Amino acid sequence: MIMQRILDEKQKAAMQKDGSTLKYMYSVAGAGKGLAAGGWTLLVIGLALTAMVSTAGVPQMLVMGAVTILPGVLLVLLGKWKQDQRDHGWVQAYAECSGISEADVLQADAEFLDSRTAVVGVWGGDKNAKKKAGFVSPNYFKVPGIWPRLYRLQDVSACFFTDQFICEDGGYAKAVVIYGTSPERCTEIVDVSEKRAAEIIGAVKAAAPSVITDRCFQYEGQTYDALEQREQVIALYNRVMGQSAQ
């Protein structure tokens, strides 16, 4: 049995920025962070240099330290401003990257607080691990990683593991592959262990039992390989779901 990671209210509250979990997760990336980090580096160097030479009474070096500090302060402020500007557009970013409406983005964000929502992909001990996490709510799937990618569960046709995902360099990698209800809506979570893949797939399956979770399967006497037959598998899912809705 795959254990789902259900957080309590206090734990979920810690995964929010300005009252939003998706904004909190979106803030994991951005050019502003790089600028601010560079600014802090200059500040540390400048302060260390100033402290070192001020006791030695070297006016020229003291000025050099001060000159290093000022650009550092400016970079920190500029980085914070750029990051705030980026984070402000989180709703639009999720909508555009996911191909869903902004109303869906806001609904998914609200469902994070639902008691049935399972958090997936909290791996590693770095401070941004939770920001890179995903979650499966009653109606939505936020894909783990730094990209603002959301699926409506009703739009997920397949979510399966493979150890034969072909990378850009021609090698193979372990991955969770996610198909939407059209061939263009596909996502891969690459370099994921089988155990971690099972965590993600198990959460999706629990919330949406109709999703295909096996790479290879048989239906009506025909064998399918979801990795090699993406369009056929998506078409099969749409046909079966269409028949069940009638």
Task: Give the role of each language-model region.
Residues 128-137, 149-151, 178-180:
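Short, exposed beta-strand/loop patches in secreted or surface proteins that constitute
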Residues 2-5, 80-136:
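Anionic N-terminal interaction surfaces
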Residues 1-32:
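Cytosolic juxtamembrane N-terminal segments of multi-pass membrane proteins
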Residues 160-246:
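Acidic, Ser/Thr- and proline-rich intrinsically disordered linker/docking segments
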Residues 141, 150-166:
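Phosphoinositide-dependent membrane-docking surfaces
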Residues 92, 150-154, 186-192:
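Short amphipathic beta-strand/extended segments with alternating polar/hydrophobic composition
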Residues 26, 142-144:
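Short beta-strand segments that buttress and anchor functional surface loops
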Residues 25-87:
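Alpha-helical transmembrane spans
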